[in-house]
Each structure stands twice: as structure tokens, then as C-alpha cells.
Amino acid sequence: MRLSQFHLHTTKETPADAELVSHRLMLRAGMIRKLASGLYTWSPLGLRVLRKVEAIVREEMNRAGAVEVLFPTIQPRELWDATGRWEKFGGQLLKIKDRKEQEFCYTPTAEEAAAEFARQEINSYKQLPLNFYQIQTKFRDEIRPRFGVMRAREFLMKDAYSFHLTDADMAREYDNMRAAYIRIFTRLGLEFRAVQADSGAIGGDASQEFHVIAESGEDSLAFSTGSDYAANVETASAALPAPRPAAGETLQRVDTPTQKTCEDVAQLLGLPLQRTVKSIAVMTTAGFVLVLVRGDHAVNELKLAKVAGMADYRLANESEIRQHLGSEPGFLGPVQPAQPIRIIADRDVAAMADFVVGANAVGVHLTGVNWGRDLPEPETVADVRNVVDGDRASDGGELRLTRGIEVGHVFQLGSKYAEALQATVLDENGKAAVMKMGCYGIGISRIVAAAIEQNHDDAGIVWPAPMAPWKVVVCVINPKQDAQVAAAAGDLLEELIAAGIDAALDDRGLRPGAMFADMELLGVPHRVVVSERGLAAGTFEYRARTAESAENLDKAGLFSRLGN
């Protein structure tokens, strides 16, 4: 590959709306160009990186026994009506009509098409299990596309759908795909975590996300120092609290005239924030509920919604609070409410003694509160809080928080989609059985941006070697003025390629400083300079992308350094 024959257009300027490092660097390196909001053209350079990722994904999917197919990106409304997702998916589903006024959608995912294909093709349990995958563009009509290809409307995705007769076999393939994903992200050279996750709108029983670790990540993750346990903060749980200690204080009323937050009350009383309890008033269709979490903790909305009877909860308004507690926000508590109410206590609160709560009287709090003496034991005890850094993990380690970018997700869907589309097979007894289904997605274009977020410096991208557009670029000084140097550089390029090294020759004739800056911006792992001085000495100037300085190597030393 000669860069004089390759479209490479780098820039120093970055559009003001490029917020993320990956967006800025991809634009500066000329990897992508914006066509419209959330729509990007991938340049030859960007496409080389994209294809490197795609190739590794395809190899590992094939290795895992999945079979490649290609579903239409445009799918009929009838399929999506059958699963209820035509309306449920909301505004992100791009809906279109053809000339006959028939309705279709540009699909963001392909569970319906996969289940319909399975219904048409699979008749007997003897054909199972089967796992079909595709690498295909998808479209989500994001309200606010941003961050370049990180949250574009059109994106490249690998999505796979497996079909099974039993839950046990579905679980087996789920583990198989999870192992394949670990191999994929390991081969890509990325630091990542597989985390427990909520299934969200796609549904299903078991779910794991794969996150590339990056400070700019939108998701907060918790992982244990004691094992490979990791989870999205939405679903992460700490270890059970220690048993409740015995009561040691008497109940007292204290004036807190202007102290409405746990932080202010703790400061006034000279107590640790962990001794206070936060009371959150909510309403459900069944009535008023008071949710209790420790003062230094926050309610986890997802966990709370999964508590029995809480699926439809909302925050109570001031009128409802006065009716049930006879007070106002800032002074609420579970002791002697104005009316009988349901109380949900977080596990940590249920294990507390001598704690502080609002007194249900303006300007007053209670100290030395104890379960069973000053108020009944909580009706419901559940894990309803977000974990915090330093929490004790169930495996004995400590939980640490980090941030990540979701790049993959695996689900056990069960029979949800197959049942809706009547995808059945004849079982061993000749009876119709609804197939079980698994779903496994990887955001291929998103991986490219996530890798840059994790791997960059002030000069540009620092690609993991498997993702780099080239492993090495040979830079030739003054190729048009020195035919001998140009010929030597061309010979070196051919030798590198013959040795199986992915190499390119920068023969564009740029000044050395501009050429080297481009190579750093592009993140090429290795740079070799061919010059008149080096040829006279029988050496090449070599520098790794992450090295502080260059060194002179003979050809044998160069090939040794490049791993051949």
C-alpha cells in the first residue's frame, strides 16, 4: 500500500460540536466525514479499521459455531406488530411507506426477522440448536445524535440469534457466546469488563453487557477486587450487611429548623452521614409507600421497580405527603405516620440501630431510633440502593466503581419472540414446541470509537495493534528528489509484506515533521524512516508509537522488533 495512491486527508482543525476525544480524532485523522446528523461516511482509512474489527468478530463467531446470514434492513410492519414492538419501540423506530402505502421500518435490531426465518426453516427439534448471525447496518432515530459514531443514527452491528428446544440448551449457547465475546475483545487488545445487566426493552431473563473501560463512558460499572464479578451499577449488589447491633440509645426529638437534608442533619448533630436514614415518598396504584435508604446511599430506581407492587411507582407530591405523613419533604420518617403506610427498607437500613430519621414534623428529627421498639419491623426489606465505591462484595473483595462504554450485549430471550411469531418445531413426541431464543449483539462501529476513547494521547490515536490500519508505515524522506532512497523504501515495503506484515509506504513527499505527525495522529504502532543518511549507515530509524524516542536498527534488528 502506497499512501500516494491512497486517499488520506488529515486536518488540524476540529469542529466545535465534537465533544468526545474519539469524535475529534476520527475527524482529524480523516476516518469519518459527516453526511447528515448522525450519519457518517467511512473513509478508506476508517474502513480499514472497521474491517479489522469485523474480521475478528466474524472469525470468532464462526469458531463458536454460528452461521452467517443476511437479513433485510427494511422489514414489514406485520412482524413488528406481532411482537408489539411497532408501538413499544417509540420514536427511535424509523417508519417508512412504499409506493403502495405499505408500512415498513428500517430496523434497529432483527429479532423479528430472525424468528420469522427460523419459523420458515426449522421444523424439527433434530435441526436444533442453530445460531444465525449477520454483520449489517442498523438505524435508530436518536432524538439527539452526538459523539460521532459513538451514538450515530446509522451504525454497523453484528447481531446473532440462536434457537433451542430447551432452556438448558439456550443457557449453554449463552455461555458459548459469552466466551466468544471474551475472545473477541481480548483479541482486539481492549481492556473490558463483562457485567451483569438489565435486559431492558429487548427483554429476557439473563443478560450481560460488555464494556470497554474508559473515563468518558456513559455507564457506571462496579467490579470486585476479589473475583471477576462485575455489574452495571443499575444491577450491582453489595454483600449482605452485618447483623443489626443492639439498641444503645433512647429515642429523642431534636430541633432541626433549617436542616432538610441528611448531610445538614448529620453535620448539625456531629454524626456520620451513615447514621442517618433518607425517606423517599412514592405512590403506586396500591397506595402510598415510604422507601428508606441510608443517608449516604441513593435509591436505585430499577431495583425499586422490581420490588413486588412497585412496577408503576412515582414520586409522591406534597399533597399526598401531607395526607399520609402530616409533614413536608425534608422532615419525613417512618415513625408514627399520620396514616398506616407500606414501608420498604433497604437491607442496610434494616440492619441499622440508633439511627436518625425525620419526625414527620417541620423542623424536627428523631435520634436513637430502633426497629421493633420505636417502629415496627419493616414490611419489606430489599436491595434498593446503588452500590458505592468501597462496598463489601459478596466474594469478600471490595467493590470499585469505574466507567465503561457498552459495546456488546448477550441475552437469553426465552420464548418471547418465537411465541409471538409462532416459531415452533416438533419435539421428540411429535408435538409442537415453541423454540427458545438467544440474542447476541456487538456494536462494530462503536468499538472503533470506544477503542480510541481508551487508547489515545495528546498526539492522537494509540491503536491496539490488531485494530490499527497498518502495523507499520515506512516513511521515505524526499522520495521525489532521491531515487535511491525511494527504491530502498519500496524494496523494504515489499519485504515487509512478503513477511506477512501489514505495511504501508508513506511516499506522499511531505516534510518529515508533517509526515511523522500524521503517523502519530493515525496511531500506527510502528514507524520506520528510510533516509539517505540511514542507507549510508545500513540502518533504518525505528520508533514505536508509544516510545519516547527513535532508535537506529539494521534490517535484521528491525524485523526482529516487528515480531518477524
From Swiss-Prot:
Catalytic activity, as annotated: tRNA(Pro) + L-proline + ATP = L-prolyl-tRNA(Pro) + AMP + diphosphate
**Assigned EC number:** 6.1.1.15
One Gene Ontology cellular component annotation held by this UniProt entry: cytosol
Q: Which UniProt keywords are listed?
A: Aminoacyl-tRNA synthetase, ATP-binding, Cytoplasm, Ligase, Nucleotide-binding, Protein biosynthesis
Tell me, what is an example of a GO biological process annotation in this record?
Answer: prolyl-tRNA aminoacylation
Stored Pfam families: HGTP_anticodon, tRNA-synt_2b, tRNA_edit
Places the protein is found? Cytoplasm
What GO molecular function annotation could you give as one example from this UniProt entry?
ATP binding
SUPFAM superfamilies on file: Class II aaRS ABD-related (SSF52954), Class II aaRS and biotin synthetases (SSF55681), YbaK/ProRS associated domain (SSF55826)
Q: What class of enzyme is it?
A: ligase
**What does the record note on quaternary structure?**
Homodimer.
Note the PANTHER family from the entry: MITOCHONDRIAL RIBOSOME PROTEIN L39/PROLYL-TRNA LIGASE FAMILY MEMBER, PROLINE--TRNA LIGASE
What function does this protein fulfil? Catalyzes the attachment of proline to tRNA(Pro) in a two-step reaction: proline is first activated by ATP to form Pro-AMP and then transferred to the acceptor end of tRNA(Pro). As ProRS can inadvertently accommodate and process non-cognate amino acids such as alanine and cysteine, to avoid such errors it has two additional distinct editing activities against alanine. One activity is designated as 'pretransfer' editing and involves the tRNA(Pro)-independent hydrolysis of activated Ala-AMP.
Which family does the UniProt entry place this protein in?
Answer: Belongs to the class-II aminoacyl-tRNA synthetase family. ProS type 1 subfamily.
What does the domain comment read?
Consists of three domains: the N-terminal catalytic domain, the editing domain and the C-terminal anticodon-binding domain.
Protein name, please?
Proline--tRNA ligase
Organism, as annotated: Xanthomonas campestris pv. campestris (strain ATCC 33913 / DSM 3586 / NCPPB 528 / LMG 568 / P 25)
Q: Which gene encodes it?
A: proS
